[in-house]
Amino acid sequence: ENTSVKFVCTDGARKKAPGRRLAWIPIVAVAAFAGRPPRAADVDRFLVVAETPDSPGLAIPTVASSFGSFAEVADAVNAERERVAALEARLASLEKRGAEPLPAPAAKDKAAAANAKDAKDDKGAKKDDKKPADPYEIGSDKKLGSTWKDGFQGESANKDFRVKVGGRTQVDAVAFSAGPNLNQPPNQGGLDPELADTVNFRRARLRVEGRMYEFYDWACEYDFVNQINVNNEVYPTERDSGPLTAVTDLWLQVREVPWLGIVRVGNQKDPYGYEHLTSSRWLNFMERSFAQDAFEGPFNNGFLPGIQILNSNEEGNVGWQIGEFKNATNPFGFSNSSGGSMTVGRLVYLPVFEDEGRKLLHLAVAGRTMEPRRQYTRFDSTTGLPIGDPITAVRFRSRGDIRNGPPGPLNSIYADTGLLQGTWQNMMGLELVGNNGPWSFQSEYFGSWLYNARTTSAGPYLTNGYQPPPGTKVGTVFYQAGYAEVLYFLTGESRTYSKLEYRFDRPVPHNNFYAFRDGGRRIRVSEGAWQVGLRYNYLCLNDSGVNGGVLNGCTLGLNWLLNPNARVYFNYDCTYRDFSSTPWKKDGTPGTSYDGSGWVHGFGTRLAFDF
C-alpha cells in the first residue's frame, strides 16, 4: 500500500534548532544503508513523524513498505548479494571448462544488452568459420557489378574479374624570367628553345586496366600529347618533332607465383628511383627532379620493355624488385638495337611502418647495369638516313623544374653533355623517405659511371657544354645528382603508402572542396586539402673534361587537393645554371667559348585530374 511517511533528522542539528525540519527524505533513501549492516544508531537518528496539516508527508509507493525495520531491509540486501556472488562463481567455473556463458538477463542497461549480442554474434561467426566453404571454381562467376573506386570500375562478386577505365589530364600555364646569358643564341651558350610563357597539356592519357581469373592483372595506357623526335640522335627541330600517341604502361602480370611473387612482362617502369616509381597523378611538384630527367628516363618517358619480379617477406617490411629491360630511347615500347640490355634491381627496408604508413621510415638502394644502346651518330643532311656504323653511346641532359612546352625534345635544355661513346654503364640510387602524420620527407641520391668514354663526332649539340675534340678518350666519366624535399599538409592529412611497389600512393583529403548556397542563401564552403612543400635539387654533369653543366634549384610548392581525383599545383622555382659552351669548327679546332650561366626564375600552375 502507499505509505505516507516523513524522515526527519534528529541529530545535533535538531538540538541546535528545535522544532525546525532540517531534511525531508523519501523512504527509498533507505538504500543508503544497504551497503553495510545496520547499526542501532541508524534507527535512532531518524524519527517517523505522523502526517500533520502543517507538515504533510510524501505519498509514494516503495519497495520497502513490506519491511518492518531497517534490519529486515539489510538482511534482504545481504541475501541478494550472496545469491549474485554464487551466480558469478558458477559462471566463472563454466567459462573455465569452456562451456557457453550463461545468457545475459533482460536488462534495462542497453550497453549490457549490446555486449551480450556481440558475444552471440562472435560465437556464430566462429561456428560459420568451422563450416566447410562452398566449392567454387575460379573464373566461373563472370558477372560484374559497377562502382566508383577512384574511377569507374566493374568487378565480380568473388573479385576474379575486374575492369577499370580511366585516364588523366594535366594542363599547365608557366611564365619565366632569365638572365641575359641564357637568352643568347644556343650556339653561344643560350637555352634553346628560348624560354617563353606557355600554356600546354603536360599529359593526356587514357587507361584501361583489370584482372582476370583472379591471378592475372593487365594494364594498357596511352599518352596523346607526347612529343617525339624522329631523329633522336641529332638536334631536334620542329620538322622532326610532333605530337604522337605513345604507349606508357602495356603489360600483363601473374600474381602469387611460388618463390617469385609477381611476374610482370611488357612495357613498364623499371624499379629504379622512388620518384620515378611514384605516379605522376600525385607528384609532390609539377616536375620530377633533375636526376629523373638526366638518369632515370631520358627519351623514353620512363617506360621500358622488359620483365620484372616483385616480392616481399611475409611481414612486408622488406621488399625487392628485379628485372631485365631493353634500354630503349623512344616512347613506343620497342628497341631494334642489338645492344642496350639492362639489369635493374631494388631492395627496400621499412624499419618503421605504423598506422598503415601514416608513420614510416623507408630505406632503399637501387642499381642498374647496362650496355649503352647502339645508335648512329651521323645522318645525311638531305635524306636524313644514317651514315656509317652505329656505336654504343649515351647522352646525359636535363630540362628545368618547370617546363616551357609539352613533353618531348622541344623543352629548353639546361644541362647537356652531348653524345658520349662508352662500353658499359653502371648506376646507383639511394632512397631515404619518411612520413609522420601531415609531415613527409623524401630524398634520393644518384651516381652514374660510364666506362671507356670518348667524345664523338656527333657532338657538340647546339645545347651541350664543353667537350674535348671528337674522338678524345676521357676514361671513366662519373656524373651525380640528388634532391631533398619536405612537405606538410596544412589541413592535417597524411600521405598513403603502397607496399606493392613501395612508394607513396594517392592522398585523400579529409573533406572534399565545395562551395554552394544553402536554402537560406548562405554560402557553405569546404576547403579540401592544402599542402606546402620545399625542394632542393642538384645535378652535376661535369667530369673528366666533359662539362655538361651544373644545376642548383629550389622549388616552393603549394598544392590544393579538391578531392582524391583533382588537384591544383602552384610552383615557384629558381635555378642557377653554371654552364659554358665551346662549339667546334669544321676543321676540328675549338671555337669561341661562351658563358651560358645565370639564374632562371619560373612560376607555374597546373590543373590535374584523373579518373
Where in this protein do the model-derived segments appear?
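Outer-membrane beta-barrel pore domains
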Residues: 139, 193, 238-240, 253-254, ...
